[in-house]
């Protein structure tokens, strides 16, 4: 079993690092009391559900229990468990700026004095920092750069980091797709709903596909859409994004949006992308 202890300065990116590790297959827990670490690992090893990689965020919020951390880590290592300490740090200036931007009190600040709180925290964390396997300074890192640092630190070069793309058709009359990163309105295309023999078919049927793509503007739109998505994929990946939801909307979510969503998925898959297609309003067909 591999256990990563994510710790470090408040505001340095422990939560973001935990989310990155979760995306990479780690079972993650936030604000784990050090005194419960041994018990949790013991329960995990005895569990029927096989968990091989765990990441626990342990920080100064643990109060007096934080002093138990190094003792717990030593005991885990004595059990032949692979324990690594990932320590997140940042300059005082950056930490102060982050706290002011988010308007949150530092856990060790006295009378709102952030600088003094940071100083107190550095002193309390000095032993853990000196024992860390890896220290990442996030002062000037974007989320994407932090992700790449973590991949490098834990030798996860073989992890599948390809952006997962979800293409979802929907009908505007049933509401916009709220969780979409990108939304495209295809109501500019002729609507097969008004052709009696096509009305009952859906965009999954050949007759609707043939009708929609019988218009030059549909083919031109698809070509431009594929080009744009392929342009954006590496940009999103660079910033650490792991999932991209693309919404394709028409009036009812049955004809045009479905045909375009299916065609977009096929084109992206043909380019080697990892794509999943779904049709939100299929229940209304």
Curated annotation (Swiss-Prot):
GTP binds at residues 59-62. SUPFAM superfamilies: P-loop containing nucleoside triphosphate hydrolases. Coiled coil: none annotated. Keywords: ATP-binding, GTP-binding, Nucleotide-binding. InterPro entries: P-loop_NTPase (IPR027417), RapZ-like (IPR005337), RapZ-like_N (IPR053930), RapZ_C (IPR053931). GO terms for molecular function: ATP binding; GTP binding. ATP binds at residues 8-15. The keyword rRNA processing does not apply. The keyword GTP-binding applies. Transmembrane segments: none annotated. It comes from the Bacteria. Belongs to the RapZ-like family. Displays ATPase and GTPase activities. HAMAP family: RapZ_like. NCBIfam families: PRK05416.1. This is Nucleotide-binding protein FMG_1084. The lineage of its organism: Bacteria, Bacillati, Bacillota, Tissierellia, Tissierellales.
């Amino acid at each position: 079993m591999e256990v990563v202890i994510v710790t470090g300065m408040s505001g340095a990116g422990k939560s973001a690092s935990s989310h990155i590790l979760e995306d990479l297959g780690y079972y993650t827990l936030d604000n784990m009391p050090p005194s419960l670490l041994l018990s949790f690992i013991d329960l995990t090893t005895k569990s029927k559900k096989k968990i091989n990689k765990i990441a626990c965020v342990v920080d100064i919020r643990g109060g007096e229990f934080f002093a138990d951390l190094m003792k717990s880590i030593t005991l885990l290592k004595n059990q032949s468990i692979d324990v690594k300490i990932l320590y997140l740090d940042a300059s005082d200036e950056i930490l102060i700026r982050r706290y002011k931007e988010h308007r949150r009190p530092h856990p060790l600040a006295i009378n709102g004095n952030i600088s003094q709180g940071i100083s107190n925290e550095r002193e309390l964390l000095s032993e853990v920092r000196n024992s860390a396997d890896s220290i990442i300074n996030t002062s000037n890192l974007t989320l994407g750069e932090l992700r790449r640092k973590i991949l490098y630190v834990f030798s996860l070069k073989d992890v599948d980091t390809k952006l997962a793309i979800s293409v979802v058709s929907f009908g505007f009359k049933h509401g916009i797709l709220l969780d979409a990163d990108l939304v495209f309105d295809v109501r500019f295309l002729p609507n097969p709903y008004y052709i009696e023999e096509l009305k009952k078919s859906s965009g999954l049927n050949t007759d609707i596909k043939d009708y929609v793509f019988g218009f030059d503007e549909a083919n031109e739109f698809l070509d431009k859409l594929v080009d744009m998505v392929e342009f954006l994929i590496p940009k999103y990946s660079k910033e650490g994004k792991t999932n991209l939801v693309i919404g394709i909307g028409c009036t009812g979510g049955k004809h045009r949006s479905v045909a375009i969503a299916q065609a977009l998925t096929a084109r992206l898959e043909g380019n080697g992308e990892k794509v999943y297609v779904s049709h939100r309003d299929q229940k209304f067909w």
